[in-house]
């Protein structure tokens, strides 16, 4: 009888130990499931932010690429503008070129500087696409972008006054319009001015894009 009781006690202890192991195993599985669900939730909330950040960086690169064409194209169009006509009334050869007017020279220099900077900033913009956590380089680009925006805007504004006088003249100052004689010259400078103002708009969008990108870091 004592041996039977001893065997029953041992079996009961074994059953209790097995039940305790089962309980511990169930708790471990629940903990692992909870950790897995939490990690999956973290991934779900992180991926959309990463995609948006990359999209902002790609948009910034595209804007810079178009701004390169706008600034360099305007500088080349203005810098190669010249025209010669023969005045039938005075029988003399009249020549005009952009370097005759200081405001147009400033326009060319401003757009050339901005275009050169934008070309150099393209590799950095590509780097930002693959490294969305970069912050210092974004701050530097934002500061220089703002300076280039001011430079191109001032150049375009100064050239606008000259182009207006070329088309309309100024009767008060007794300045006749020259576009009646130099129509090709006026068409070129007007076209380059339009391209420069498009570059100004693109630079504004670049600054806004850079500011948004920084605010998300």
Swiss-Prot record:
Function: Regulates membrane-cell wall junctions and localized cell wall deposition. Required for establishment of the Casparian strip membrane domain (CSD) and the subsequent formation of Casparian strips, a cell wall modification of the root endodermis that determines an apoplastic barrier between the intraorganismal apoplasm and the extraorganismal apoplasm and prevents lateral diffusion.
InterPro entries the UniProt entry points to: CASP/CASPL, CASP_dom, CASPL
Topology, Cytoplasmic side: 1-57, 125-138, 213-217
GO CC term (a single one): plasma membrane
Assembly and oligomerization: Homodimer and heterodimers.
Species the sequence originates in: Arabidopsis lyrata subsp. lyrata (Lyre-leaved rock-cress)
Highest taxon in the source lineage: Eukaryota
Main subcellular localisation: membrane
Keywords, in A-Z order: Cell membrane, Cell wall biogenesis/degradation, Glycoprotein, Membrane, Transmembrane, Transmembrane helix
UniProt similarity note: Belongs to the Casparian strip membrane proteins (CASP) family.
Disulfide partners: none
Subcellular compartments: Cell membrane
Membrane topology reported for the UniProt record: Multi-pass membrane protein
PANTHER family in alphabetical order: CASP-LIKE PROTEIN (PTHR36488:SF12), CASP-LIKE PROTEIN 1U1 (PTHR36488)
GO biological process, one term: cell wall organization
Positions of transmembrane segments: 58-78, 104-124, 139-159, 192-212
Glycosylated sites: 170
Name of the protein: Casparian strip membrane protein 6
Pfam families the UniProt entry points to: CASP_dom (PF04535)
Extracellular side: 79-103, 160-191
């Amino acid at each position: 009888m004592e041996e039977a009781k001893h065997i029953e006690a041992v079996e009961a202890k074994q059953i209790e130990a097995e039940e305790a192991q089962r309980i511990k195993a169930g708790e471990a599985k629940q903990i692992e499931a909870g950790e897995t669900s939490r990690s999956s939730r973290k991934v779900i909330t992180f991926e959309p932010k990463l995609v948006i950040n990359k999209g902002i960086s790609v948009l910034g690169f595209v804007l810079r690429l178009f701004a390169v064409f706008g600034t360099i194209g305007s500088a080349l169009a203005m810098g190669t503008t010249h025209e010669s006509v023969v005045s039938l009334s005075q029988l003399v050869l009249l020549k005009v070129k952009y370097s005759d007017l200081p405001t147009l020279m400033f326009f060319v220099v401003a757009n050339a500087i901005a275009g050169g900077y934008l070309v150099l900033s393209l590799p950095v913009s590509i780097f930002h696409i693959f490294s969305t956590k970069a912050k210092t380089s974004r701050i530097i680009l934002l500061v220089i972008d703002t300076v280039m925006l001011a430079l191109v805007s001032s150049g375009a504004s100064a050239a606008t006054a000259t182009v207006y006088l070329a088309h309309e003249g100024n009767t008060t100052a007794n300045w006749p319009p020259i576009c009646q004689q130099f129509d090709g010259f006026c068409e070129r400078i007007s076209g380059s001015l339009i391209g420069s103002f498009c570059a100004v708009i693109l630079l504004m969008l670049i600054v806004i894009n850079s500011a948004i990108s920084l605010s998300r870091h």
